[in-house]
Amino acid sequence: MTDQPFLNHMKIKYLLPLALIAISFTYITATTVIPPTFEQLVQQAELIFQGTVTDVRSVWEGEGAQRHINTYVTFQIGENMKGNAGSSYTIRILGGTVGDETMEVTDTPKFKMGDRDILFVEHNNDQFVPLVGINNGRFHVQRDGQTGRDIIVNGEREPVRDVTKFGREEESVSAAEAISPDQFKSAIQKQLTDQADRSAQ
């Protein structure tokens, strides 16, 4: 059996209530995720879009032992690259803070108002983080303080230089070497075209 670059969302759904009982909604440790390649990111995603965060809202949901906090993050869509997220799209992520109670899930992305991101979305409302490879499916558009240009950083806020290195160890990259959002989106479009051509053969 080959390793999968993303979590089995059905397993997460069944194991979650037991984890919540055991730790009283304090911390959940995520299973180690094998970083997907760029090809896997594009292929696995049901939606790929660039958007700006316009709302972040955490609420208690569920009953009894399955009561937990979900966070809803809404994006104003700037560009759809795969699928159609419409003009506004909301993802649901397990965990968050309501009042003075926090339920934290390690390795999950944290969003705030005004964030500009390119997301690779799968199984929204069905798995605890609806991104391909969890934090690997989020790419942040960040303004470089030295040059003033927008660059792409990954879920760990590390500058991205070469999409072909995804899923493999890459040496440290400086902000000056990072690709722009337009370059990243061009790489996505090329991968989508290549995958469509292979499917048509």
At which residue positions do the language-model features occur?
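Transition segments tied to proteolytic processing and entry into folded domains
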Residues: 11-201
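Positively charged n-region of N-terminal signal peptides that target proteins for export
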Residues: 2-14
